[in-house]
UniProtKB/Swiss-Prot annotation:
Natural source organism: Psilotum nudum (Whisk fern)
A Pfam family hit: PsaA_PsaB
UniProt EC number: 1.97.1.12
Binding site for [4Fe-4S] cluster: C559, C568
Keywords recorded for this protein, A-Z: 4Fe-4S, Chlorophyll, Chloroplast, Chromophore, Electron transport, Iron, Iron-sulfur, Magnesium, Membrane, Metal-binding, Oxidoreductase, Photosynthesis, Photosystem I, Plastid, Thylakoid, Transmembrane, Transmembrane helix, Transport
Record-given protein name: Photosystem I P700 chlorophyll a apoprotein A2
GO cellular component annotations of the record: chloroplast thylakoid membrane; photosystem I
GO molecular function list: 4 iron, 4 sulfur cluster binding; chlorophyll binding; electron transfer activity; magnesium ion binding; oxidoreductase activity
Purpose of the protein: PsaA and PsaB bind P700, the primary electron donor of photosystem I (PSI), as well as the electron acceptors A0, A1 and FX. PSI is a plastocyanin-ferredoxin oxidoreductase, converting photonic excitation into a charge separation, which transfers an electron from the donor P700 chlorophyll pair to the spectroscopically characterized acceptors A0, A1, FX, FA and FB in turn. Oxidized P700 is reduced on the lumenal side of the thylakoid membrane by plastocyanin.
Homology family: Belongs to the PsaA/PsaB family.
Length: 734
């Protein structure tokens, strides 16, 4: 008889109920809990899976390039980036009638196509690609790279090629490889590509393999580099009337510090970007060589941490014991990585629209909206995941003996103070923000809008002024013509910055008022509450006053009976589960704010946001309802249009979201009864009863039902907003 699923758990494989399938799927990636797992095999499996991950990523990016080259309109878009709509790929759908075929035939295509809102066209254009041939070449290169990584993953699972445990735990060598090898050298390579290919292309000079070694990126070649006259590389930058992609107005500089945006493309100067990557490369290549690897010189991370004791001894033993705790816990490392990557992803969202790096992307409004929203949602999931693995670390990997009186132990010791302070901050923000909104609603409802409480964000405006925004009249630092910072900025560094920050047509330091003040605090409420739930979940994961032995129950347990006063909803998993709802709601507010602020900016009616954002009805009526009108009437008895698919997705997203509640608001017993009734009916129905199943059907566990509910809630929520965002933006701006 063939071995039953799951092979990794004999106990589960022998379970006679459908629980075997669901628990098997749920624990498939929890390698630590599998039969016959050793620490070494655990590390080897994860290491090999990284190659698989890279394979999938390169295959996906290769597919993007291939489909645009095959079915897109890249060459036509390059001729007129502001008016040609970029095509992602063709659509073949047997359900399309003639009206649909006509509605989706756009961008100069011969049949129905999807428009690209990912920004890849702008990116490829900026980095020097110009023809479909370029795209095909890139696709084939990435496909080969993908195959290479797939082979590497397989290879590192073979007996002679499996790294040992000591190799995985060598922190200094890993830092050397990651900082210098991956970050440093790749940044240097990218700076090289920008200087040798992208910048010449932006000046009308076509550099490809055949002339790469003969075309000088700078007229003086390497002579200024070796003679130490590096400033020569910054002289003669592109002029403000440079026509991107041509020699008109082009300069010869390759590494500059201009600041601001290229007037025509509304994106950062390519020479500034190249300079940035070169600087990053230098910093990281040096950083990666500071640690002790083969030669007995440089820092030892363990020694640094052991020596790091706070002065005066009042803060305990500092970082003693942390090295082994972190180095022996994959969950701790993953938690740190997710937290860092989550923050970086959110920063990417903020910087992609305020400091656009790709030519013409700032004028592609739907793409700007899609990229901002996408990166904020990704950041939310990464950040919540960080706390989930932090909690698992405390349950599975934390050793109190190893960490006596160090920073970790002290966090646990004063967790009540941390949790109660977060709770206080959340309550304060919530009641005051809601109170202001509701007061303003009441005033508008009673016909006295002048009695609203409107608070100017003076501190934030002052910070904007210090960075050079003159509108508020603060006359401080960069907004003061008398300050040394202002004078240096005119010549020494970033001369283009002040023009950019005071130009109202971009998204740099947007003008803010009372509506921004309120929504800022609403978002702060969401962030603090999400953090409260996550921090409490992690700090209470080992035990709490109510349930001191919680760690014995593991990461996710539904209840521990009535004996302790009813300990349901108390596991670390439950905290994560609750936090994800808060995370999604908070990002909802963040994206609503960003999107509404920007559509009024792009349409030239910022007064609508300023006037309507100070009360809740304004948000509901003038943002959500007004912008969903095209979706609510997306297709009707009189026909359809190119927004119909988004209207359908808007409905479908609501449906998926609502299905989530079916799993969230119910009791397990109800489902078990229902399932047994259905099984009974099935067994007594002719023909149907010829089909039998081996496993006895049982209801999902409480935790599993919550997971399924949460998954539907999240997916439906994101689908709904994605359809709303893309349709309302593309419907207005084409």
């Amino acid at each position: 008889m063939a071995p039953r699923f799951p092979k990794f758990s004999q106990g589960l494989a022998q379970d006679p109920t459908t629980r075997r399938i669901w628990f098997g799927i749920a624990t498939a990636h929890d390698f630590e809990s599998h039969d016959d797992i050793t620490e070494e095999r655990l590390y080897q499996k994860i290491f090999a899976s990284h190659f698989g991950q890279l394979t999938v990523i390169f295959l996906w990016t290769s597919g993007n390039l291939f489909h645009v080259a095959w079915q897109g309109n890249f060459e036509a878009w390059v001729q007129d980036p502001l008016h040609v709509r970029p095509i992602a790929h063709a659509i073949w759908d047997p359900h399309f009638g003639q009206p649909a075929v006509e509605a989706y035939t756009r961008g100069g295509a011969s049949g129905p196509v999807n428009i690209a809102y990912s920004g890849v066209y702008q990116w490829w254009y900026t980095i020097g690609l110009r023809t479909n041939q370029d795209l095909y070449t890139g696709a084939i290169f990435l496909l080969a790279l993908s195959a290479l990584f797939l082979i590497a993953g397989w290879l590192h699972l073979q007996p002679g090629w499996k790294p040992g445990l000591s190799w995985f735990k060598n922190a200094e060598s890993r830092l050397n490889h990651h900082l210098s090898g991956l970050f440093g050298v790749s940044s240097l390579a990218w700076a090289g590509h920008l200087v040798h290919v992208a910048i010449p292309e932006s000046r009308g000079e076509h550099v490809r393999w055949q002339n790469l070694l003969t075309a000088l990126p700078h007229p003086r070649g390497l002579e200024p580099f070796f003679s130490g006259q590096w400033s020569i590389y910054a002289q003669n930058p592109d002029s403000t009337n440079h026509f991107f992609g041509t020699t008109q107005g082009a300069g010869t500089a390759i590494l500059t510090f201009l600041g601001g945006f290229h007037p025509q493309t509304q994106s950062l100067w390519l020479t500034d970007i190249a300079h940035h990557h070169l600087a990053i490369a230098v910093v990281f290549i040096i950083a990666g060589h500071m640690y002790r690897t083969n030669f007995g010189i440089g820092h030892s991370i363990k020694e640094i941490l052991e020596a790091h004791t706070p002065p005066g001894g009042r803060l305990g033993r500092g970082h003693k014991g942390l090295y082994d705790t972190i180095n022996n816990s994959l969950h701790f490392q993953l938690g740190l990585a997710l937290a860092a990557l989550g923050v970086i992803t959110s920063l990417v969202a903020q910087h992609m629209y305020s400091l656009p790096a790709y030519a013409y992307i700032a004028q592609d409004f739907t793409t700007q909206a899609a990229l901002y929203t996408h990166h904020q949602y990704i950041a939310g999931f990464l950040m919540t995941g960080a706390f989930a693995h932090g909690a698992i670390f405390f349950i599975r990997d934390y050793n109190p003996e190893q960490n006596k009186d160090n920073v970790l132990a002290r966090m646990l010791e004063h967790k009540e103070a941390i949790i109660s302070h977060l709770s206080w901050a959340s309550l304060f923000l919530g009641f005051h923000t809601l109170g202001l909104y509701v007061h303003n609603d009441a005033m508008l409802a009673f016909g006295t809008p002048e009695k609203q409480i409107l608070i100017e964000p003076v501190f934030a405006q002052w910070i904007q002024a210090t960075h050079g925004k003159a509108l508020y009249g603060f006359d401080v630092l960069l907004s003061s013509a008398n300050s040394p910072a202002f004078n240096a900025g005119q010549s020494l560094w970033l001369p283009g910055w002040l023009d950019a920050i005071n130009n109202n047509s971009n998204s740099l330091f947007l003008t803010i008022g009372p509506g921004d003040f309120l929504v800022h605090h609403a978002i702060a409420l969401g962030l603090h509450t999400t953090t409260l739930i996550l921090v409490k979940g992690a700090l209470d994961a080992r035990g709490s006053k109510l349930m001191p032995d919680k760690k014995e129950f593991g990461y996710s347990f539904p209840c521990d009976g009535p004996g302790r006063g009813g300990t349901c909803d108390i596991s670390a998993w439950d905290a994560f589960y609750l936090a994800v709802f808060w995370m999604l709601n908070t990002i909802g507010w963040v994206t609503f704010y960003w999107h509404w602020k920007h559509i009024t900016l792009w349409q030239g009616n910022v007064a609508q946001f300023n006037e309507s954002s100070t009360y809740l009805m304004g948000w509901l009526r003038d943002y959500l309802w007004l912008n969903s009108s095209q979706l609510i009437n997306g297709y009707n008895p009189f026909g359809m249009n190119s927004l119909s698919v988004w209207a359908w997705m808007f409905l479908f997203g609501h449906l998926v979201w609502a299905i989530g509640f079916m799993f969230l608001i119910s009791w397990r017993g109800y489902w078990q009864e229902l399932i047994e009734t259905l099984a009974w009916a099935h067994e007594r129905t002719p023909l149907a009863n010829l089909v039998r199943w081996k496993d006895k059907p049982v209801a999902l566990s409480i935790v599993q039902a919550r997971l399924v509910g949460l998954a539907h809630f999240s997916v439906g929520y994101i689908f709904t907003y994605a359809a709303f965002l893309i349709a309302s933006t593309s419907g207005k701006f084409g």
